[in-house]
Amino acid sequence: MHETGKITRKAILLSYWVDEHEKFKSDLDFGLVKSFLKSAAGGCFRDEEIGEYASVFFTRKSLFELLDCYDYMFVYFSGHSLFENRQVQIPLKNSEVIAESEFIRPDKKLWIFMDCCRTQREPMNSPDFELPRKENLFPQSCPQRRENWVFKISQMEPFSLIYYVTKLGEFAFSNAIGGFGTQIFFTTLMEKLDSETTFDFGQLVREINQSPIAIQESSYIPGSLDLKEFSSLF
């Protein structure tokens, strides 16, 4: 499952949808995220290291058990969520929920990616937007790049990076082929990695927010994470 003696890792992609059309959009977003995860920039994840789930598959207990099993986890969520006490609340099985802060586990390394609204306001229609799905330009996976990535993250101190596709109190929009935040993050990342030799995560987020096609503003909480060290993973 992973390089022996270095680090255990898992990516879990979660979604909450209410009809087949929303499930279709979620599946497209999952595909884009998986393209990144399987690439050299994302860590050369193998299929068995990536789990795709409806969020209601999990109870709180079973999700916590999964989170506690690995040294590094990439957690992605898209779809409908609740919002309470200034936190995203993800619906789970048996009407349970998990708050975004509860994903953070002691002594673990986590990147949490939230493509959902962060407001209690009544939903509004998404503005029109079009982000063409581009060919996969992420750097290709290979055994050496995988080994290097695993070694680098194994040397990092525990961290919890939370990336939000929208600001506190705002909506996250989508169209027929998925969430705006997921699409613009990974397509912009793809373009930068294809054209630049030095990558900077903070600069990526600034460019996303300054894009002339931006309809929402992303943000992130790095906690104790060394962003320069994290950027070297890409």
Predicted segment positions?
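Cysteine endopeptidase catalytic domains of the caspase/legumain-like
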Residues: 1-234
